[in-house]
Amino acid sequence: GLIVDSKVTRKKPLDPLASRLVGYYLDEGTRTYRVGLEGGFNDHVLKGEDGLREVQRIQKGLWKPVNLDNTKEPRDGYDLVTTIHSNIQDITHSTLSQVLRQYRAERGLAVVMDVQTGAIRAMSNLNMNPDSTYSETYNAAVADLYEPGSTFKLMSLIAALEDKKVDTATTFHAKYGQYKVYDKYIYDSRKGGYGAINLATAFAVSSNTAFAEMINEGYKGSAQAFVNRLYSMKLHEPLGLPIEGEQAPLIRYPGDKGWSGLSLAWMSHGYELLMTPLQVLAFYNAIANDGRYIKPRFVAEVRRGNQVVRSFDTEVIHPSIASTKTVKIAQRLLADVVEKPYGTAHKLYDKHFPIAGKTGTAQVNYQLGKENVDYVSSFVGYFPADAPRYSCIVVVHRPDKNDKIYGADVAGPVFKSIAQKVYATSPFVDQVR
């Protein structure tokens, strides 16, 4: 006779899109691999129950059913409905891939998030393979801790405004584009610096020296007050995602190992601290959401067939990360980065489609000397600037140093292209949970 042993395997119909986020579950007996949503939801949602049938051994290795009916029927697992929007995911993946190839970057990522609900509409993580092609092998958006560089100036800005250390008219006078802390110097990217500039302009031009002066002088003798303010905005806590791999941010407290007299000045513009790209995006999303800090959401609901078994609602991390006044100032200054002719992202300006955000160009391996320095280019913000619907972060690691390296040149165009294509082709995506 014939005994059929059937097995069910899971396929990724949109592979390679979001393949690392969709993930997999693999049980090899001695070790279990849990990646992405499948890894996180396999045991209690996706995994079904085996059935039972009474069989009789007729000879070694051969069995026959005793009855035609099962003593216990197998039960399929539930279906998981994600928040990913296939069109937005396709746009994000293809746009990021094109720019990574253009700048021969080591890797890059892009994430699109719904401002009001926290729903992740797209997530692409691409790494260069040995043959110079790109594929998803690691979820850097969730798991990669990095120094965010100038994109952290938003956090420093809000802290200083909330603690009334400055206002937007406060003037900074760093000479020759450099600021000295003990025997170390912080430099502006513009040779010779910007002269005397106020805080609003310093944010638009992304002056490292102005922000170092603002935080180092403003919190002199009270470094713990600066870190306490960051902690009050939940910046030191992980997001608590339903998939494995998220790293907790590293924001040192005065007295911790690694803290020094240089720490305030370096933290002011995104060094000596570590965050994941998704943690940075969630904070910017809070500014777009008028201060309401919400948890990124990957899953809309669990279903069995057409029946909804469970819905996943928006989770609030902090109802208001700052005062309404401070949030409004931050929104205006983020728009100025793009709108003002002197803003670092002005080349992304389009009067018909305003976007708001912040550029970042962080150095890596700077401890090894100038010849070993590489760069991480980033842009994070939201669109449209005047009525935010989506927030987005783009991070590109190690673009070719012989080509463009700045956030406005490498990551910024990815953001703008995603924003324009998403808004042109998916105007009603908010109807999808």
Write out the residue ranges for each language-model feature.
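Structural motif corresponding to the C-terminal cap of alpha-helices
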Residues: 95-103, 128, 338, 400, ...
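Amphipathic, well-packed alpha-helical segments that form the structural scaffold of globular domains
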Residues: 46-49, 81, 93, 97, ...
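Short, gly/Ser/Thr-rich active-site loops of penicillin-recognizing serine hydrolases
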Residues: 308-316, 412-433
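Small/polar-residue-rich segments within soluble enzyme cores
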Residues: 1-76, 394, 413
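Beta-lactam-recognizing serine transpeptidase/beta-lactamase-like catalytic domain environment
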Residues: 58-71, 110-149, 155-398, 407
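Short, charged, low-complexity patches
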Residues: 34, 85, 89, 280, ...
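Conserved, well-ordered alpha-helix/loop/beta-strand core segments that scaffold catalytic motifs
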Residues: 65-108
